Amino acid sequence: MSDLSLGRLPTNDSKKTAPDSTTMESFSYDDGIVRLFLIATIAWGLIATVAGLLVAFLLVMPGLVDGLESQVASMLSFARLRPLHTNAAIFAFGGNAIFAAVYYSTQRLCKCRMWSDLLGRLHFWGWQLIIVAAAVTLPLGITQSKEYAELEWPIDLAIAVVWLGFFGGNFLMTLWNRRERHMYVALWFYIATIVTVTVLHIFNNLVVPIGLGKSYSIYAGVQDALMQWWYGHNAVAFFLTTPFLGLMYYFLPKAAERPVFSYKLSIIHFWSLVFIYIWAGPHHLHYTALPEWASTFGMLFSVMLWMPSWGGMINGLLTLRGAWNKVTSEPVLKFYVVGLTFYGMSTFEGPLLSVKSINALSHYTDWTIAHVHSGALGWNGFMTFGMIYWLLPRLFQTKLWSKKLAEWHFWIGTIGILLYIVPIYMAGITQGLMWRAMDDLGRLQYPEFIESVQSSVPFWWARILGGTLYVAGILMLALNATMTWLGRPSKYDEPVYTAPRLSRFYEDSPIPQSPLAGTPVLDTAVRLDKVSAMDWHRRWERFPVRFTLLTTLAVIVASLFEIIPMFLIRSNIPTIASVKPYTPLELAGRDIYVSEGCYNCHSQMIRPMIAETQRYGEYSKAGEFIYDRPFQWGSRRIGPDLAREGVKKQSSFWHWTHFENPSKFVTGSVMPSYKHLLEQKLNFKEIQKRVDAAAFLGAPYDKELTEAESMAQKQAEVFAAEIIAQGGPVSYNGHLIKDSTAIALIAYVQRLGTDLFAVPPTAPPAEKPAEAPATETPPTESATTTDAVSETTPTVA
């Protein structure tokens, strides 16, 4: 509608009755903060993509850093750098792009300067320090191991302060002090982003700290998995989708010089996304130990998401009606068209992948990686590039240095995306088919996991070419931005604008009468017509506090309906009598597993599928994970599943040698050497506080509460003796192997999956009355595996 064109809102649709309604006020915009975020976006975008390129090389060349000192090499491993790449891409590149868009558009849509210049600067520098902290801690192995929420609790606290206090407070106070009566659609999406990310961040990161660099989640196992993917899915929704839709609704009409196609469609688009998106997270956990009702719920809402998502894409593309001739000559519009197209592709593929039968094939494969990158590179990346090219001449008050170079960036970037995602789609589908393939006798056609890895290597090499082209495009952007900046004036012009102060007294225009009124139709039809006209929504748009509360209510209500049953209904996590908490040494080994990022390559979740149970063993049960903080189910299998690794009875010496040189036992392995684990000495003194924290969270420890260190040392001696007896060394790197960090990790790996087949502890016999004669009780038969497990799930093909 034309009243929403180019970010301008109507001011004459209602009458103002206050005597001060014509009071004019002068103001200027704070474009300095936008320049800062824009420069940071380009810089971090280059760093994030170069890091991704390095990670891609490390996957196919695991020995790339072997020449370095082992401790340095450990910080540059694939498993340590992959979370760094994802965090840099999302929160550094994507985050700074969001902030640049919000600070630029909000001031113009509200006809006022940001409420506080100081909060804006605190926000900028605080966010950059958070990114630097992530860049330091993640390679050091300081991580929570939750996707998109890897950062430890001190950084999480800083994020909460910077996001809600500096950014959210500044934004909401700007809305409160605006000089434009109605809030434009872009502002709605910004509100939803700020509110929902706050809720997600706080409740997913509730932990018990045991030090500055380590904490345990208050959630365990299945509940932790549900909370993580409630957060993980909606982090994509409300950090990588809604703010970029706000960006689209402001900058696309500006660039096209056309009004937004449909105001009504934008209303439907917004509220549908806000309400439906929050329910969809459990579709990431199909066929896992999560109760089936929860994952089915997630699937249904994911499928429903397709319609409002495409409503937004259509609204964006049809905004270009009458302006398609400009697309051929304007690189900004080219970026927006392709970005919106990738948004449409991703929001179709997402619901598709949520369907259980398709997810059974795609989950844990590179198909998910291709899906994520088509959205990140195509939607988020190209929408950001379009915004940057549009802003550069306006912020630096000079002509864009090279329009031709921007064109080259577009074409090279587009080709790069295609060369990246197509091979990875092929790799993912190939992996899924090979893992499930059975011969005529019902046996695995590819019994060795390494066969699927070797088939993927050519595709992994091909995606490096695509990634290189994408990085080359960002280098072109950086050059163009730098040269444009060098052509800036010696002093920026800062125009002063005037606008009337908003009156505190306001009378809405009456809602127009339905054209069906007075016609021979039911009263219900007249009321429905008035509702569908959506004039009522115009009233909501002038109340930022009410609008924010309604958005918050929609998000919280949807979340509670999903989360509360999982925590209150005990049958969701049936008890397994034989499951016991980890020993002190195993608990330390589990923390090493988390620190090394093993979850990036290995899952610990065997799905109830014939091919998986033949390959890995008995499928996983919800009750097995009640002491797992955080859960380690993983989302990708570059290596085999480890949920039953302890049941395989692999020797401890095999694991020791495998950590030192993985390819010695598995030819063609892409696992790097973990020699540093053999060289490092385990800090036994720190184990006690880990046990104390686990006990505080419910682990039923007894003498471990006072003897954790000595118990860990005794168990380490047992494993060391076993390794030595099997031909291993007595000492390594100047210390006895019983003191090695690798011993703790081996203890943990050897424990995995064994509880399900253990004999459950028996209750002590009740005391007999003193006067009763002593009688001999015959021995009872040991509990079988079936007795120990109190839950069943049908196995599916």
Residue ranges and their predicted role:
Residues 2-3, 35-142, 153-175, 187-212, ...:
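Hydrophobic cores of alpha-helical transmembrane segments in multi-pass integral membrane proteins
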Residues 585, 594-600, 605, 638-641, ...:
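Short pre-active-site segment immediately N-terminal to redox-active cysteine/selenocysteine motifs
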Residues 570-594, 608-609, 731-738, 786-787:
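Electrostatic cytochrome c docking/interface patches
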Residues 527-582, 713-722, 748-777, 787, ...:
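Post-cleavage N-terminal segment of exported redox proteins
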Residues 601, 667-674, 756-765:
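Surface-exposed patches in mature extracellular/periplasmic domains of secreted proteins
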Residues 589, 595-604, 655, 745, ...:
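The canonical Cys-X-X-Cys-His
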Residues 1-31:
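Short, Lys/Arg-rich, polar N-terminal cytosolic tail immediately upstream
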Residues 551-556, 614-741, 796:
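Electron-transfer interface patches adjacent to heme c in soluble/periplasmic c-type cytochromes
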